[in-house]
Amino acid sequence: MARPDDEVGPAVAPGHPLGKGYLPVPKGAPDGEARLVPQNGPEALNGGPGLGPLIAGAQGGPQALIAAEEETQARLLPAGDGEDVPCPACPPRTALSPRRFVVLLIFSLYSLVNAFQWIQYSSISNVFEDFYEVSPLHINWLSMVYMVAYVPLIFPATWLLDTRGLRLTALLGSGLNCLGAWVKCGSVQRHLFWVTMLGQILCSVAQVFILGLPSPVASVWFGPKEVSTACATAVLGNQLGTAVGFLLPPVLVPALGTQNSTGLLAHTQNNTDLLAHNINTMFYGTAFISTFLFFLTIIAFKEKPPLPPSQAQAVLRDSPPEEYSYKSSIWNLCRNIPFVLLLVSYGIMTGAFYSISTLLNQIILTYYVGEEVNAGRIGLTLVVAGMVGSILCGLWLDYTKTYKQTTLIVYVLSFIGMLIFTFTLNLGYIIVVFFTGGILGFFMTGYLPLGFEFAVEITYPESEGMSSGLLNTAAQILGIFFTLAQGKITTDYNSPEAGNIFLCAWMFVGIILTALIKSDLRRHNINTGLTNIDVKAVPVDSRVDPKPKVMVSIQSESSL
């Protein structure tokens, strides 16, 4: 029997009933003239066009009668040009492109550099405070500008992704990242803090075109058995950049001189020149790498593979472009209660991670004076452990498809990890902080791809870029709030524990919201055939593509 998700269905064996939603088509009828019509529609009830006495319509629905097996054959017509041949002779509808690994690697690398530029100031905040002669709040804003820029720009960036595609979005992200890196190279003088801020603003705009791409890249290029792992790998690139941002700056730009009575570093002229040289080395190295990756993006990053990698992507490709509405997509997501709950809970978790990452150097140095290098290494441990968690979570999702259960368990374990990290900071053993930071990072950072993939599942067939963009918007807004609030609480009470407890309270709220999410795995149901698909429209002649297209309505009948 022909199936709705087949591009070219096999002929129905004589004497067997037709599939739901299909009418028999006379053998030899031209593909461009025959149509798929709605079940219970007027043409279906009247026997369909051009079928004459072959079909008798009853009041309860059309009854397909094959008058002569030699003369008539029931089949599902192909979406484009094709011959009436059995399914085994047809080309496969879906296929995996070897280029998918190249695209994923390029994206992960320039995402890595962008994340490195985000955290490179905060990981040695005391050094930059003294070099530019500014307050800790100024350095914190070099991190928070990433969050501020994201909120107003995510909607035009998402519109661009949905209307112009992956390639242009990738070029903008990589290009602006490169431009920002070069601007910073001109800021290595003590009175040019505003120039380094300008470069950071450009990098923060680039981030808008980067953070929302893991899910679209994974969905467009990877098959259903590897999509979660691919998304986790794409997120991994960003996490690795954060890890490198904690590791390299303390090594490339070590603190020089001795502290004076104000707590700032007292520099001689020679020390200042050496510090400027070290900062220059870091900035120029970043700029050269960013330039190389930008040219690599131009050469090798393609829009999409020749054939869709999954049935879910094939259905979306068959939908005519006229059917997509940006405003309707936003409205549909806002009315999706499970997505709204995930939106807030994801924002809490990721915002807490942003706050911890931004303030980690200040938190560690409160208890362990002079341990700038180890503070960076603790940040590295936190992120590397999270990278391992991300990959394991992605593999687990591809194997089990237990999105809600996994998300909830990881959320609870992140909360427990945060409590352990908070109440072991003041023990006086920095090795303990390494260990507890690793536990915290494994679960907190490992949660990030879970949120992306869970959102795509419960919002399909809405744009992956839209759902990812809204998740990141919530994360940026709450990241700004948490960073400012935690920083002030830590300063007022002179205790990082108070600020961490503030984050723990919010994470507990996130656990409750996650538990309330209804798990309706729409994309998974399409790929496994658990969702009822009714072909309910005739082929559409698009102004863009002259080939007929089939419009599909998805009706989910199960909630896993």
From Swiss-Prot:
<feature type="topological domain" description="Cytoplasmic">
    <location>
        <begin position="459"/>
        <end position="466"/>
    </location>
</feature>
<comment type="similarity">
    <text>Belongs to the major facilitator superfamily. Feline leukemia virus subgroup C receptor (TC 2.A.1.28.1) family.</text>
</comment>
<feature type="topological domain" description="Extracellular">
    <location>
        <begin position="426"/>
        <end position="428"/>
    </location>
</feature>
<keyword id="KW-1133">Transmembrane helix</keyword>
<feature type="transmembrane region" description="Helical; Name=TM6">
    <location>
        <begin position="271"/>
        <end position="300"/>
    </location>
</feature>
<dbReference type="GO" id="GO:0005886">
    <property type="term" value="C:plasma membrane"/>
</dbReference>
<dbReference type="GO" id="GO:0046620">
    <property type="term" value="P:regulation of organ growth"/>
</dbReference>
<dbReference type="GO" id="GO:0097037">
    <property type="term" value="P:heme export"/>
</dbReference>
<feature type="transmembrane region" description="Helical; Name=TM5">
    <location>
        <begin position="227"/>
        <end position="252"/>
    </location>
</feature>
<feature type="transmembrane region" description="Helical; Name=TM2">
    <location>
        <begin position="136"/>
        <end position="163"/>
    </location>
</feature>
<dbReference type="GO" id="GO:0043249">
    <property type="term" value="P:erythrocyte maturation"/>
</dbReference>
<dbReference type="GO" id="GO:0015232">
    <property type="term" value="F:heme transmembrane transporter activity"/>
</dbReference>
<dbReference type="GO" id="GO:0001701">
    <property type="term" value="P:in utero embryonic development"/>
</dbReference>
<dbReference type="GO" id="GO:0042733">
    <property type="term" value="P:embryonic digit morphogenesis"/>
</dbReference>
<keyword id="KW-0813">Transport</keyword>
<feature type="transmembrane region" description="Helical; Name=TM12">
    <location>
        <begin position="496"/>
        <end position="518"/>
    </location>
</feature>
<feature type="topological domain" description="Cytoplasmic">
    <location>
        <begin position="401"/>
        <end position="402"/>
    </location>
</feature>
<feature type="topological domain" description="Extracellular">
    <location>
        <begin position="493"/>
        <end position="495"/>
    </location>
</feature>
<dbReference type="InterPro" id="IPR020846">
    <property type="entry name" value="MFS_dom"/>
</dbReference>
<dbReference type="Pfam" id="PF07690">
    <property type="entry name" value="MFS_1"/>
</dbReference>
<keyword id="KW-1003">Cell membrane</keyword>
<feature type="transmembrane region" description="Helical; Name=TM9">
    <location>
        <begin position="403"/>
        <end position="425"/>
    </location>
</feature>
<dbReference type="GO" id="GO:0015220">
    <property type="term" value="F:choline transmembrane transporter activity"/>
</dbReference>
<dbReference type="InterPro" id="IPR011701">
    <property type="entry name" value="MFS"/>
</dbReference>
<dbReference type="GO" id="GO:0001568">
    <property type="term" value="P:blood vessel development"/>
</dbReference>
<feature type="topological domain" description="Extracellular">
    <location>
        <begin position="118"/>
        <end position="135"/>
    </location>
</feature>
<keyword id="KW-0496">Mitochondrion</keyword>
<dbReference type="GO" id="GO:0048536">
    <property type="term" value="P:spleen development"/>
</dbReference>
<dbReference type="GO" id="GO:0031966">
    <property type="term" value="C:mitochondrial membrane"/>
</dbReference>
<feature type="topological domain" description="Extracellular">
    <location>
        <begin position="368"/>
        <end position="371"/>
    </location>
</feature>
<feature type="transmembrane region" description="Helical; Name=TM1">
    <location>
        <begin position="93"/>
        <end position="117"/>
    </location>
</feature>
<dbReference type="GO" id="GO:0035108">
    <property type="term" value="P:limb morphogenesis"/>
</dbReference>
<protein>
    <recommendedName>
        <fullName>Choline/ethanolamine transporter FLVCR1</fullName>
    </recommendedName>
</protein>
<feature type="region of interest" description="Disordered">
    <location>
        <begin position="1"/>
        <end position="43"/>
    </location>
</feature>
<feature type="transmembrane region" description="Helical; Name=TM8">
    <location>
        <begin position="372"/>
        <end position="400"/>
    </location>
</feature>
<keyword id="KW-0675">Receptor</keyword>
<feature type="binding site">
    <location>
        <position position="476"/>
    </location>
    <ligand>
        <name>ethanolamine</name>
    </ligand>
</feature>
<feature type="modified residue" description="Phosphoserine">
    <location>
        <position position="542"/>
    </location>
</feature>
<feature type="topological domain" description="Extracellular">
    <location>
        <begin position="186"/>
        <end position="192"/>
    </location>
</feature>
<feature type="transmembrane region" description="Helical; Name=TM3">
    <location>
        <begin position="166"/>
        <end position="185"/>
    </location>
</feature>
<feature type="topological domain" description="Cytoplasmic">
    <location>
        <begin position="164"/>
        <end position="165"/>
    </location>
</feature>
<keyword id="KW-0597">Phosphoprotein</keyword>
